[in-house]
């Protein structure tokens, strides 16, 4: 793997090497390893999440070495550089028409894809539901048992290389039409109510205590979150700016499904 990594690094610094067969073979090998889950753009470590920049470089370099091709699926036709993912039956994945995933995205067994889209470099772990019109962007990392509700947008990131992708950890519930972009991390078992929008600059305010606690870029584990707003002064006057409010917690002690249902009911959260 070290040899492949060095080939990728050399090609990144010298694009003329993209004409060499050794380079193109190495790039395609990385994409194949991403496709089967043997490599990841980002992975959990004992010190938090680690971004593998060289893998992201391989994904970026994959585009210029590919040629446009017509892809025919029954009466439907596509024209693109990246092939579609295949072999769902053998992988134990349920795919409802017209869900689409690109080659180079890993999707684990027991996952359900309703009509949705999963981009190259993404990692979708076991037992996750990607609901209708949800999108999983390039290199996004989705954990086990996650529910991405209808119309959810999980942003992708290829560049800048050092930027972390959006990370949705295990057993998270993301409500309808939520958006998470710019490397936001939603930690284990958190619940996002419908229409929550999270960017790296979005204020996430914990209002469960006597005083508000502000944070950005991270939703703590088991938090129950709804959309909110705060007042900000501008030259033209005071206006409301969107934020996210932490209004409660899922209980650790109960069954995951039970704790989810209780959290939604107790906090009156729409999903």
Model-derived regions, located:
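Terminal amphipathic alpha-helical/low-complexity segments used for targeting or macromolecular assembly
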Residues: 1-93, 222, 227-271
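Structural signal for interior beta-strand "rungs" in well-ordered beta-sheet cores
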Residues: 93-233
